[in-house]
Amino acid sequence: YNFWDGIVKNKRYKQEEETCAKICEEALKDMGLWEIRNQLARNLPYGMQRRLEIVRALVTSPKLLLLDEPAAGMNEDESESLAGVIREISEKNKGITILVIDHHMDVIMSVCDEITVINFGSQLATGNPEEIQNNQEVIDAYLGVGD
C-alpha cells in the first residue's frame, strides 16, 4: 500500500469509505502530506514519516494522543516544525489530550500546558512551563547537581 491506502484502510472498519476518505484527506492536508499521498511511507524523509504516524493516530479520533519522543532523530528545524504541528493539533482538536514524552525540553516547553518532570522514575515536579523552567530542583536535575 501507499500511505494513503494504509490510512484509509485503517479507518474503514468504523465509517463509510466516503466519510473516511474525507477525514483522511483533511488530516493529511493539515500535516502537509496531501500532495505526496501516493508515495510509499518508507520513501518519505524521517520527519514526514513521523507526521504520518501522527495522522494515522488522529484519523481514529482518539481522546488521548500519546507522542513518545516525537522529536527523536530530528534536527532543530524539524523539531520546531513538529512543535508547531502539535500546537495546531491541540488547538484544532479541543476534545483530545496530548501526552508528550520527550527529552527535548524546547519542544516540551513550547507545546505543553502542564508538564511533569520525572527523574530516575520519580516525579520531580509538575506545573506549567514557566513553573518548571524556574523550579530549582528541575534545574539541578538537568545540570546533574545534587544527590
Task: Describe every region a protein language model picked out.
Residues Y1-D147:
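Glycine-rich phosphate-binding loops of nucleotide-dependent enzymes
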